[in-house]
Amino acid sequence: MADYQDKNVVIIGLGLTGLSCVDFFLARGVTPRVMDTRVTPPGLDKLPQEVERHVGGLNDEWLLAADLIVASPGIALAHPSLSAAASAGVEIVGDIELFCREAQAPIVAITGSNGKSTVTTLVGEMAKAAGVNVGVGGNIGLPALMLLDADRELYVLELSSFQLETTSSLQAAAATVLNVTEDHMDRYPFGLQQYRAAKLRVYEKAKVCVVNADDALTMPVRGADERCVSFGVNMGDYHLNRQQGETWLRVKGEKVLNVKEMKLSGQHNYTNALAALALADAVGLPRASSLKALTTFTGLAHRFQLALEHNGVRWINDSKATNVGSTEAALNGLHVDGTLHLLLGGDGKSADFSPLTRYLTGDRIRLYCFGRDGAQLAALRPEIAQQTETMEEAMRLLAPRVQPGDMVLLSPACASLDQFKNFEQRGDVFTRLAKELG
């Protein structure tokens, strides 16, 4: 447990996470100061009166006078104001670092470009099925500090690369990097390896490292060691086994579950299930209750979620596909009887869209591209693409064209912030329009 008495603490970024940091310090007799680049940040009205605040920008004077800065994952450590504070010797951490200094129960830590929310939730469900008092959150749901409780027996945290950059005290009982594909390249000027290095921090003091046998970028820098357990499609300690048209989850050669007993579908979800099982096994959760959780878990909203099935047409909301790798996961091995009507677009965050090209072949696919990077996406295969300003225009364009056996898939490969509040709002709009047009 760290001692923050008489420390001059500055919190950057409000919202739910920022407020959880404020509460954390107030409970320890320390009154922090808060700043946010937004003029009216969310949660401003919930900030206790005694907490000094500075909005609409950063206050360099406060930062340089601080003993400790707690930075929101939304602000880059490379920001000139933070660089100056770091150079002046000010300690800069995030909420996850504060959490790790206090947590008494084992931590399962999950990161990766795609699938981390599903795997985090699944491991949480496995723990609940075993009757374990578990706190699930971090980059999903509740901020980590709101989970702290002396009665907890386990924590399951989803961690982003930004959160890991400011964390040094994490000693996970089990940690995984599910996959590494381009994302947030606007925050990583040195490219994929810089982004990967942030993700790999999760392994630093971990007891067990769960790695993806199909993705060498998920391996610790020094290579797999005796701490490593692997999962993969065909390779790995935890893998898939296909026999006579049936697919099984297998652990070290032993069949443990037929995927038809699971509510989740799609190869990417089967590998998510393998990763979750490996993590649950690593922290000693009973296998039987973990498998039971796999048969009841229905998946998360906006993640390859069936929004509507009507007149033989399936409308799928995969709005959470905010990067290229996530859309690749949706398209890989996808079976459609008729034509796939694929909605792509939004803010691509400087990503390279070319890996999608291999999935856009044949004559049973149509592209509808919208938003800031719509033109770039339409250029992947112009002869089957139509570009519109908004997603709604695209959906009104495609609706009269769909036939029984077709699929309409929103898997945009882009962030939503150019036209929507967040990916949830984008998914909700898609679902509403699907019900209206389908």
UniProtKB/Swiss-Prot annotation:
Q: Which SUPFAM superfamilies match?
A: MurCD N-terminal domain (SSF51984), MurD-like peptide ligases, catalytic domain (SSF53623), MurD-like peptide ligases, peptide-binding domain (SSF53244)
Offer a single GO CC term for the protein: cytoplasm
Kindly list the cysteine pairs connected by disulfide bridges: none
Top EC class per UniProt?
Answer: ligase
Q: Which reaction does it catalyse?
A: UDP-N-acetyl-alpha-D-muramoyl-L-alanine + D-glutamate + ATP = UDP-N-acetyl-alpha-D-muramoyl-L-alanyl-D-glutamate + ADP + phosphate + H(+)
Q: What is its main location?
A: cytoplasm
Family matches, as Gene3D superfamilies = Mur ligase, C-terminal domain, Mur-like, catalytic domain, NAD(P)-binding Rossmann-like Domain
Where ATP is bound, by residue? 112-118
* Domain of life the protein comes from: Bacteria
Q: Which UniProt keywords apply?
A: ATP-binding, Cell cycle, Cell division, Cell shape, Cell wall biogenesis/degradation, Cytoplasm, Ligase, Nucleotide-binding, Peptidoglycan synthesis
Q: Which InterPro entries match?
A: Mur-like_cat_sf, Mur_ligase_C, Mur_ligase_C_dom_sf, Mur_ligase_cen, MurD
The record's Gene Ontology biological-process terms are: cell division; cell wall organization; peptidoglycan biosynthetic process; regulation of cell shape
Write down the Pfam families for this protein, in alphabetical order.
Answer: Mur_ligase_C, Mur_ligase_M, MurD-like_N
| EC numbers | 6.3.2.9
Where, if anywhere, are coiled coils annotated?
A: none
Pathway connected to this protein: Cell wall biogenesis; peptidoglycan biosynthesis
Q: Which PANTHER family match?
A: UDP-N-ACETYLMURAMOYLALANINE--D-GLUTAMATE LIGASE
Purpose = Cell wall formation. Catalyzes the addition of glutamate to the nucleotide precursor UDP-N-acetylmuramoyl-L-alanine (UMA).
Q: Protein name, please?
A: UDP-N-acetylmuramoylalanine--D-glutamate ligase
The primary gene name is murD
